[in-house]
Amino acid sequence: MAAKKTESLSFDAALGELEQIVQQLEQGDLPLETALKQFERGIQLARVSKQKLEQAEQQVQILLQQGEQEKLTPFTVEQTSGQNAEEE
């Protein structure tokens, strides 16, 4: 697979490529040098994906601040398990 410029990939493309790399590494059939290159590529993709998620989170917070004057609360996993973020 030709190495694409990591920063220019969309989040979905980076995640898809990362999933393929994980599958290849889990199979354990790659030669050591190839596995190391794939691991390095995976780290790059994971970092870029994390940055894109953080940027999206910031955009959502900005949009919420513009739309409402209420206090924003950080998203936590507990809020998705039946608790409402407005119940504080």
Curated annotation (Swiss-Prot):
Q: Name one GO molecular function term.
A: exodeoxyribonuclease VII activity
Which Pfam families does the record cross-reference, listed alphabetically?
A: Exonuc_VII_S
This enzyme's EC code(s): 3.1.11.6
This chain's protein is named Exodeoxyribonuclease 7 small subunit
- A biological process (GO) annotation for this entry? DNA catabolic process
Keywords noted in UniProt:
Cytoplasm, Exonuclease, Hydrolase, Nuclease
Q: Is Transcription one of the keywords UniProt gives this record?
A: no
Q: How does it assemble?
A: Heterooligomer composed of large and small subunits.
Q: What class of enzyme is it?
A: hydrolase
| Record-stated family | Belongs to the XseB family.
